[in-house]
């Protein structure tokens, strides 16, 4: 059987190192830099001939540069005769551009899927895709992992009144996600229907469900400028919720997000480390991080050994 070779792109080296440590591996030698004309340079520093290669690169920070770096790393490993190349993309880039929502709009998520395939990726591992149908954009296998087991564990360990909580989706699209968590905790759920005027601007919110005298836990796959979740927190408190938490898989936190969280009435805003959060945490004491490196590491181990990955949909590996 070929050996695992694990490479890290430059988007999230801390997460890559955590995954490597859990697998008992050293990260592979790779040098990524820019040429003087700003083209991306990648040098793979060890043989990958016949090996099972995994490249960890999240869709965050300088997204376009990081995506290009990932594509070049995949292609470099492929033409160096690796037996299989798996792109491990904790936060999938362009995932919100998954449909034609207005005239002449591009479906950029499909374009990214095509680019990964053409570069030479044989398999994709990602987490909490914005729309699970994105898996259908690929002609290669895609494992869409879920942060839900780690979220359930965090709720049980950190919210003492979790049996008196209510799980709330900040929009109708997240109803499936919150009902799954509510069922697993054996609590009720609610959702907030919002009418958007334009991107990143929230107009009117309608709460469906009774949150009075309960701990409200907002759950979503991502938060960008945080306008939606901060408005939702105000709505929940005015409807009688005793406390409000927000739990998100991908904390993008761009623009005014940090100041909005600081000014909002959250007990905590909990995110996973699919995106680096160290700098954001320095400016916001409410942000807490769930480490999901063990889920990615176990997915890599199971994929390499030809085992089922679906166990991870409902369990947190030790």
Curated annotation (Swiss-Prot):
One of its GO terms (biological process) is AMP biosynthetic process. InterPro entries: PRib_PP_synth_CS (IPR000842), Pribosyltran_N (IPR029099), PRibTrfase_dom (IPR000836), PRTase-like (IPR029057), Rib-P_diPkinase (IPR005946), Rib-P_diPkinase_bac (IPR037515). Keywords: ATP-binding, Kinase, Magnesium, Metal-binding, Nucleotide biosynthesis, Nucleotide-binding, Transferase. Residues 212-227 are annotated as: Binding of phosphoribosylpyrophosphate. ATP binds at residues 96-101, 130. It catalyses: D-ribose 5-phosphate + ATP = 5-phospho-alpha-D-ribose 1-diphosphate + AMP + H(+). GO terms for molecular function: ADP binding; AMP binding; ATP binding; carbohydrate binding; GDP binding; identical protein binding; kinase activity; magnesium ion binding. This is Ribose-phosphate pyrophosphokinase 2. It comes from the Eukaryota. GO terms for cellular component: cytoplasm; cytosol; protein-containing complex; ribose phosphate diphosphokinase complex. It comes from Rattus norvegicus (Rat). The gene is Prps2.
């Amino acid at each position: 059987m070929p050996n695992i070779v694990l490479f890290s792109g430059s988007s999230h080296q801390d997460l890559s190192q955590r995954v490597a440590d859990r697998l008992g591996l050293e990260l592979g030698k790779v040098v990524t830099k820019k040429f003087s004309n700003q083209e991306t340079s990648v040098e793979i520093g060890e043989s990958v001939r016949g090996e099972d290669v995994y490249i960890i690169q999240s869709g965050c920070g300088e997204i376009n540069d990081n995506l290009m770096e990932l594509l070049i790393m995949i292609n470099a490993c492929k033409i160096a005769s690796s037996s299989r190349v798996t792109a491990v993309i904790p936060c999938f880039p362009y995932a919100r551009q998954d449909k034609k929502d207005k005239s002449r709009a591009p479906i950029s998520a499909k374009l990214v899927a095509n680019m990964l395939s053409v570069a030479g990726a044989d398999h994709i591992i990602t987490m909490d895709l914005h729309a699970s149908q994105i898996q259908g954009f690929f002609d290669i296998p895609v494992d869409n992992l879920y942060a839900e087991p780690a979220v359930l564990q965090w709720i049980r360990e950190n919210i003492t009144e979790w049996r008196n909580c209510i799980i709330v989706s900040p929009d109708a699209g997240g109803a499936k996600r919150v009902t799954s968590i509510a069922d697993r905790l054996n609590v009720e759920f609610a959702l907030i229907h919002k009418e958007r005027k334009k991107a990143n601007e929230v107009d009117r919110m309608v709460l469906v469900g009774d949150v009075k005298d309960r701990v409200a836990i907002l759950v979503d796959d991502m938060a960008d400028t945080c306008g939606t979740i901060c408005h939702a927190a105000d709505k929940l408190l005015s409807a009688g919720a005793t406390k409000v938490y927000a739990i998100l898989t991908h904390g993008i936190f761009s623009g005014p997000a940090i100041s909005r969280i600081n000014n909002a009435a959250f007990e905590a805003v909990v995110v996973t480390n699919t995106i680096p959060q160290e700098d954001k945490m320095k400016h916001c004491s409410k942000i807490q991080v769930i480490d999901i490196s063990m889920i990615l590491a176990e997915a890599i181990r199971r994929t390499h050994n030809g085992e089922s990955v679906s166990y991870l949909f409902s369990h947190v590996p030790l």
